[in-house]
């Protein structure tokens, strides 16, 4: 069981909106840069909160995505600003804490959209994002999740995750065939009303299986 820490960790960092590079990156993708932070020296910053990196020799700039639970900072994700094969680095201050973005901003008694990435979740109302594998979200007070995976009908990992979600009886979004964009952020940038598309394409049970079998390309 996870209990919120007694000693609060703080993000003594500028907002991503205050740095031209991180603000430019996020604004170009229509993401609200005031919701995130910016670390000029990511490894050094993380080590100041939790000894994580043995060496800070090749440090780098990253956008900081904070993970909160009951107003406590329980972890963070660093998103690379420059080209980097490791786009995201997740650091948890307690390994039992939920690797979920947005938990403090939702109503658990209403339907909750569950996206693959924190940035995608910011475009939807009452949404969270998984910052790791699909977690058991029931224990975090979410009774009616609607799972939203990337629009990648040839990605075996995504296909197996959708299949597991359907088999569990949960609701899942199956993207219509006319949409080519890979994720919610790309869809928003192309001018789609994503919230409406999601409402019209949420399924469960046998209907979800039928739609899934039509959508997948493997």
PLM features: what roles do these ranges have?
Residues 1-64, 68-70, 106-107, 199-218:
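TOPRIM metal-binding catalytic domain and adjacent DNA-binding surface shared by DnaG-type primases
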Residues 4, 16, 28, 39, ...:
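A sequence-composition feature that detects small, non-aromatic residues
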Residues 4, 8-10, 28, 73, ...:
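Generic secondary-structure boundary/loop-capping signal
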Residues 19, 23, 73, 181, ...:
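Alpha-helix initiation and N-capping motif
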Residues 30-31, 75, 128, 188:
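Generic short alpha-helical hydrophobic face used as a protein-protein interaction/packing hotspot
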Residues 48-144, 158-159:
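Phosphate-handling DNA/RNA-contact segment within nucleic-acid enzymes
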Residues 86, 108-112, 118-218:
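TOPRIM fold recognition
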């Amino acid at each position: 069981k996870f209990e919120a820490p007694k000693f609060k960790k703080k993000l003594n960092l500028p907002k991503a909106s205050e740095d031209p590079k991180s603000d430019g990156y996020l604004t170009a993708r229509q993401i609200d840069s005031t919701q995130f932070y910016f670390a000029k020296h990511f490894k050094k910053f993380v080590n100041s909160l939790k000894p994580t990196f043995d060496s800070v020799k090749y440090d780098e700039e990253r956008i900081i995505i904070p993970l909160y639970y009951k107003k406590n900072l329980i972890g963070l994700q660093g998103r690379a600003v420059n080209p980097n094969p490791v786009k995201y680095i997740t650091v948890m201050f307690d390994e039992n804490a939920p690797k979920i973005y947005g938990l403090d901003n939702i109503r658990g008694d209403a339907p909750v959209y569950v996206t693959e990435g924190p940035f995608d979740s910011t475009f939807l109302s009452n949404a969270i994002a998984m910052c790791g594998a699909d977690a058991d979200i029931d224990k975090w007070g979410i009774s009616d999740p609607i799972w939203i995976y990337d629009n990648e009908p040839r990605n075996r990992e995504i296909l197996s995750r959708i299949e597991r979600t359907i088999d569990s009886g949960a609701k899942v979004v199956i993207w219509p065939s006319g949409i080519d964009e890979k994720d919610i952020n790309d869809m928003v940038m192309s001018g789609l009303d994503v919230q409406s598309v999601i409402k019209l394409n949420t399924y469960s049970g046998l209907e979800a299986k039928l739609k899934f079998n039509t959508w997948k390309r493997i």
